[in-house]
Regions:
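Flexible beta-alpha connector loops of hexameric P-loop NTPases
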Residues: 26-35, 77-88, 150-158
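A short beta-strand-to-loop transition that corresponds to the Sensor-1 phosphate-sensing loop
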Residues: 7-8, 56-58, 74, 109-112, ...
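Conserved Walker A/P-loop ATP-binding site and its immediately adjacent core
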Residues: 1-18, 37
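Conserved motor-coupling elements within RecA-like helicase/translocase cores
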Residues: 17-53, 64-67
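Switch/connector loops and helix/strand junctions flanking conserved nucleotide-binding motifs
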Residues: 11-14, 36-39, 62-63, 78-81, ...
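SF2 helicase catalytic motif II
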Residues: 51, 58-106
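Conserved interdomain linker/interface between the two RecA-like ATPase lobes of SF2 helicase motors
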Residues: 91-167
Length: 167
């Protein structure tokens, strides 16, 4: 399994959760590690000694012998987008890898990206699972997409839809 977190700072708590379940088969990969540390983790994954990789977007490229699951935590975060060459979005690479290997792909977010929401509507392979309440028990907020082209077509010059202004 590959588990992506948007920030290196989130790695320790995520790693500890997975280590409590999977023990020493969990590898960690991120850019703050030395080249030697990254190589050791990469090699342990390649040899099958580590079966779960937790890290930032570069963790996607670990040589997993068998890949059954990819999890992207907080999939809406912009940090999953690589701006310098080679340019890629970790979500798109993960989707391609999952399709190619038959792995399950789980995108987690309380506020999913528009791209992911759209894909769930138009692609039968993508399914949206909505939790009815938050972890703290509070209800989820109502979310609606408003068509600003219609607002402007009605002569509005505001950057906020009338529906937002009325509430």
């Amino acid at each position: 399994a590959i588990v992506l977190v948007p920030e290196i700072a989130l790695s320790p708590q995520t790693v500890s959760r997975f280590e409590s379940r999977f023990g020493d088969t969990v590898a960690v990969m991120h850019s703050r590690m030395t080249a030697g540390e990254r190589f050791d983790q990469w090699e342990a994954v390649r040899l099958g000694k580590k079966r779960v990789v937790v890290g930032a977007r570069s963790a996607l490229f670990c040589p997993m012998a068998t890949l059954g699951l990819i999890i992207i935590d907080e999939e809406h975060e912009s940090t999953y987008k690589q701006e310098s060459a080679p340019r890629y979005h970790a979500r798109d690479v993960a989707a391609w890898m999952a399709q190619r290997t038959g792995a399950a792909l789980v995108l987690g977010s309380a506020t999913p990206s528009i791209e992911t929401l759209c894909r769930c509507k138009v692609d039968d392979m993508w399914h949206r699972v909505v939790l009815p309440t938050r972890a703290n028990g509070k209800p989820m907020p109502e979310v609606r997409i408003l068509d600003m082209a219609k607002e402007f077509g009605r002569g509005s010059r505001s950057m906020f839809a009338k529906e937002l202004q009325d509430n």
